[in-house]
A protein has these predicted regions:
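N-terminal export/targeting leaders of redox proteins
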Residues: 1-34, 54, 70, 94-188
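The canonical Cys-X-X-Cys-His
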Residues: 38-49, 81-91
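Short, well-structured alpha-helical interface segments that form or flank functional binding sites
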Residues: 28, 40, 79-82, 172
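N-terminal, post-signal-peptide region of Sec/Tat-exported proteins
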Residues: 42-74
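Processing junctions and N-termini across compartments
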Residues: 36, 78-81, 120
Length: 188
């Protein structure tokens, strides 16, 4: 009986999620979200356990591992090798010099291992993003807030001179996450 009660308590947050949007609207929002999170500007840092940021699909020539022997290791900041902040300084200045190391108003680092998107399918990333165990502990509202407020996300949409970016703005993807969540976060 205790096991049944525990299972019901664990399932309650998903069951309690109000679905105010249609499944079709949620799937359309997910398609727009995936278009953004699968862009190389995002996947080149969302690399998972390899800890090696990439320079893929950005118009710099052949796809390759980030230069300078960068390895994020378990710290995600490269503390055991070349720290990200060796080149990616923390500053609020605009990124105006083409191909210079980008900078933001936060300490440069890779996302947590659980947020690996490089080489993953839409269904895999969808399952990751809807599960707090694999999305850095966020519910839908917290995901949307992260997308609106993260200096990393803001930089990804406006990376500066000579750099490609996904279409839209942080507000666009945050609004789509809210629609997707209101539809029950459907994946297919």
């Amino acid at each position: 009986m205790r096991l049944l009660i525990a299972a019901l308590l664990l399932a309650a947050p998903l069951a309690a999620q109000e679905t105010t949007e249609s499944r079709e609207a949620g799937l359309a929002a997910w398609d727009r979200i995936f278009e953004k999170v699968s862009h190389p500007r995002c996947t080149n840092c969302h690399v998972g356990e390899s800890g090696q940021p990439m320079w893929n699909g950005l118009g710099y020539g052949a796809d390759t591992v980030h230069g300078m022997g960068v390895l994020a290791d378990e710290t995600r900041i490269g503390a055991l090798s070349t720290p990200c902040r060796t080149c990616h300084v923390t500053t609020g200045r605009a990124n105006t010099v083409p191909h210079a190391p980008p900078h933001i108003s936060d300490a440069w680092r890779l996302p947590p291992v659980e947020l690996a998107w490089l080489g993953r399918s839409s269904a895999e990333i969808c399952a990751q993003m809807r599960d707090p165990e694999t999305n850095d502990g966020n519910d839908i509202a917290e995901l949307a807030e992260h997308l609106r407020s993260s200096p990393f996300v803001a930089w990804g949409y406006a990376p500066g001179a000579g750099r490609s970016a996904p279409d839209g703005t942080p507000e666009d993807i945050a609004a789509d996450v809210e629609i997707w969540g209101a539809a029950g976060a459907p994946c297919d």
